[in-house]
């Protein structure tokens, strides 16, 4: 197995992201957040934007799942949606590049099969992760050549709004042979452990660790 994949097997990956409208939006802060995650035992980091990734690499040497969130007016796909974002991440040297692999139309109107074929031909040694929202998408991602699937978008597409992340994870791990990374709505250590027991290769946790406004709100709401 690939050494990068082996290094994250059965372990926690922390998603260090803060968008423009969030209190901790700052590449410097994300770098320190990644260091805090490393200090706590994280085996990898998921990060958004070249700027954040550069800063994170100054602070830790952990494997990075890189994405670029870019909104295009003609599509709902925004996680590394075009070849431009892929190449920006390639140039930054991230170990894994995650891409929206849902069945929604891409902004460049490219078919997902042709899109992954093009970038894998150009960058044969790069690991690509399919961010999916359903079992069918996971199966298709494996078929067309993705190296990893992640349950990142379960519940976030119009056709999976009522899906539960761990329930979908159970279905995905039964039908695909490539590593499945559990991600999305894993907001407690117990859920992370459960994901591994279900068969996840690794687990990504974001907001429950790195978004203090969300953590604070959970306390406030519970105390009402």
From Swiss-Prot:
PANTHER family: N-ACETYLMANNOSAMINE-6-PHOSPHATE 2-EPIMERASE-RELATED. Pfam families: NanE (PF04131). One of its GO terms (cellular component) is cytosol. One of its GO terms (molecular function) is N-acylglucosamine-6-phosphate 2-epimerase activity. This is Putative N-acetylmannosamine-6-phosphate 2-epimerase. Disulfide bonds: none annotated. InterPro entries: Aldolase_TIM, NanE, RibuloseP-bd_barrel. GO terms for biological process: carbohydrate metabolic process; N-acetylmannosamine catabolic process; N-acetylneuraminate catabolic process. It comes from the Bacteria. Keywords: Carbohydrate metabolism, Isomerase. It catalyses: an N-acyl-D-glucosamine 6-phosphate = an N-acyl-D-mannosamine 6-phosphate. It comes from Fusobacterium nucleatum subsp. nucleatum (strain ATCC 25586 / DSM 15643 / BCRC 10681 / CIP 101130 / JCM 8532 / KCTC 2640 / LMG 13131 / VPI 4355). Its EC number is 5.1.3.9. Converts N-acetylmannosamine-6-phosphate (ManNAc-6-P) to N-acetylglucosamine-6-phosphate (GlcNAc-6-P). It is an enzyme of class 5 (isomerase). Pathway: Amino-sugar metabolism; N-acetylneuraminate degradation; D-fructose 6-phosphate from N-acetylneuraminate: step 3/5. Belongs to the NanE family.
